[in-house]
Amino acid sequence: MLTQQELKQQAAEAALELVEQVAGPDVIIGVGTGSTADLFIDGLARFKGRLRGTVASSERSAARLAGHGLAVLDLNDVQSMPIYVDGADEIDPNLHMIKGGGGALTREKIVASVARRYICIADESKLVERLGRFPLPVEVIPMARNAVARGLSRLGGQPALREGFVTDNGNIILDVAGLSIADAPGLEKTINDIPGVVTCGLFALAGADVALLATQDGIRRLERRG
């Protein structure tokens, strides 16, 4: 029986096989944030000298990449990337996700938007029929905390401030429990339209293109329909 850590490693290795397919001196790889992304970063070290560089979705990931001797580029200097690789807190069969447990949701969305394909890596426990058991992170401009919290409460959520946490952008996170997420793209737009919200941790309007889910029987690959 593989442990969860071993499953995460398996998912990271599957993504590294995709990097092998696209690697080249002009290639830039987008890299996410979190425990599974950390394993991907560690494996990416073997491509040192075979890539132009990487773009990181957080200061944490940038430091880990640099520690392996991989170039970390400013997104403003990058026009496109073949793939962006990141984990998920939850993912459904439509490849909609909840992300942001590590607090990097805004930069994750931004970096992912520049990649041609979004590759989600996770262990099979993250696959759910409907999103919402994991509290939904929402990045909020500090002065709008209470106003946004009231708006989230009107949507049926129970927002709680993530104590002692500040995002790389200098903002706060509200973690919202109790939401019924039957229409993930619709809810993502509704929450993002609340004044003071930077973005929410729903990745549904632009979800993953491919999910590589590690199971006890190997990698299960899901691809976005249509």
Curated annotation (Swiss-Prot):
Keywords: Isomerase
Gene Ontology annotations for the cellular component aspect, listed alphabetically: cytosol
GO molecular function, one term: ribose-5-phosphate isomerase activity
GO BP term (any one): D-ribose metabolic process
Pathway of action: Carbohydrate degradation; pentose phosphate pathway; D-ribose 5-phosphate from D-ribulose 5-phosphate (non-oxidative stage): step 1/1
Catalytic activity line of the entry: aldehydo-D-ribose 5-phosphate = D-ribulose 5-phosphate
Alphabetical list of InterPro entries matching this protein: NagB/RpiA_transferase-like, Ribose5P_isomerase_typA_subgr, Ribose5P_isomerase_type_A
Residues annotated as binding substrate: T33, G34, S35, T36, D86, G87, A88, D89, K99, G100, G101, G102, K126
Protein EC: 5.3.1.6
Active site: E108 (proton acceptor)
Gene3D superfamilies (UniProt xref): 3.30.70.260, 3.40.50.1360
Disulfide bonds: none
Protein family (similarity comment): Belongs to the ribose 5-phosphate isomerase family.
Subunit structure: Homodimer.
Functional note: Catalyzes the reversible conversion of ribose-5-phosphate to ribulose 5-phosphate.
Matches recorded under PANTHER family: RIBOSE-5-PHOSPHATE ISOMERASE (PTHR11934:SF0)
Designated name of the protein: Ribose-5-phosphate isomerase A
Lineage of the organism: Bacteria, Pseudomonadati, Pseudomonadota, Betaproteobacteria, Burkholderiales
Gene: rpiA
